[in-house]
């Protein structure tokens, strides 16, 4: 009878590092309410967006203009086609190596260890954000729309623990592969 309590406990313990990293990410990189320390250290030239800021896929900022042209075009077309249902916003696109390195360091501090941090934040040497081949999309309704329709544009959700993270993975109209469990599992 003690067995049913154990899985729930494991689930709670495994959720804690995820919650810490998500709180960090929300506070620093891809969501509203980024930390002021990150704001002081980075600029829009690094792909950094200020606290609570999102951008349109059509904005003229490095987080968008430094995206791979094919990805940028696919995201712009998807946003245009989705606009009757949802206003698709980008919370993070291209990032400088310097910003990506700092995000990983801060996620490691927030989660308590590098292994948990790497489930959500890759290092600059392997990050798709650094190469301009990934975008983080908000709001959740836009993520839901892209999960359903993104393959029409070649856009697929990359990680099951990051519903907001999309990459150009298949040819338009293809079938998206199942998302990897997390960034660590994919790398």
Residue ranges of model-derived segments:
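Secretory targeting and sorting signals
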Residues: 6-32
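Cell-envelope/glycan interface and biosynthesis
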Residues: 30-187
